[in-house]
């Protein structure tokens, strides 16, 4: 076992949970799977330490509804499902927020499902989902990240009701270590024109295990939050 991997027992000790809970976190995508050795599940140490850092931030994690309200506001869109009072409260809170806190509070924005698939799935799937993270290379604001490497997998959001049809259509196989990440959400209204809100793209990048991608996402969130503070002056 290399230093970039750890057992579920080691991860559980760091997180203060049970190995079974760590396995569930890996299954849901909150922790990345490194590989399996027989029946032993090895998780990515970097993703465990990232989760440890997130848990240091105070505040109860937002519901999907609130998370998408905040991410839409930060992206310059109007969350029509939120009341005027809710939007005002969120704006005031965002103006006092750091990127790390935003990432922590919006952790429930979707449920992550990982799969493996063939080359056809990797090539065509982005046309059926709202791409995000390193897969959002065609977003009109992508150049702001200054990232040049091509994505190796697929990352994107889908309505919860469309997950099963997509899995069947592309013959995807559930795999905790798979390079296809489908994030199911119940807030389709947040995806104007079928696009992921820009702030969500940045948040997803901050959670990347690639240092350059994570830094690019963090820097963009810093800029977006600063712009919101500027509007208050």
Give names to the regions the model predicted.
Residues 1-25:
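Polyanion-binding surface elements
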Residues 92-233:
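Phosphate-handling catalytic interfaces
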Residues 3-5, 38-42, 153:
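A generic structural signal for beta-strand entry/edge sites
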Residues 4-9, 80-91:
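Short acidic, hydrophobic short linear motifs in intrinsically disordered regions
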